[in-house]
Amino acid sequence: MKDAEIIEVLRRKVDVPVGRHLYGIIGSYDSLNRFSSELSKATRTDGSPFPQPISVNKGLLEFFSDTEFRTTVETEAKYPQPTRKKIEDAFDRFIRNHLKEYGLIILQDLELVFAYNVNLNPLRTLAADERKIILLLPGKRSDKTIIMYPHCTEGENPLPTNLIAEDHLWLLDV
């Protein structure tokens, strides 16, 4: 879809006060940057601007002190599950804090979340009623599956099925 068409649908959907509000925009890094720029110029139906996208990678790293981060990196290969749990907990706190403060958040740069296979299903519960999340996801559609980071050589990273409702998920034109 064209950027303007997606933005128009988002304008209507995010201002509905009840229901699930987890949205996904899928495209290349270039098309996501273009879309993000266009979305930042758009206003919601009440005239307020859409918020600027938030880098999840940067936000997660800020949850760790320098010492804790160094220890985590040094022990990651030996203890991958505790590292994954730390990232998952930091992601949960990050999302909850931003939703509480802003209500509507746009998330980009989710590479750490996918690299550590963080469970994304809590996003469905958190993004409801007055709390809304828009995910900017680098990926492509392959049959009925969304493949995240399709240029990654480490294998496929499918977006969990049923995470985002089909009518809340859009593929950007190139």
Feature map (PLM): residue ranges:
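Short glycine-rich substrate-engagement loop in P-loop NTPases that contacts/grips substrate
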Residues: 68-96
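AAA+/P-loop NTPase substrate/partner-engagement loops
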Residues: 48-71
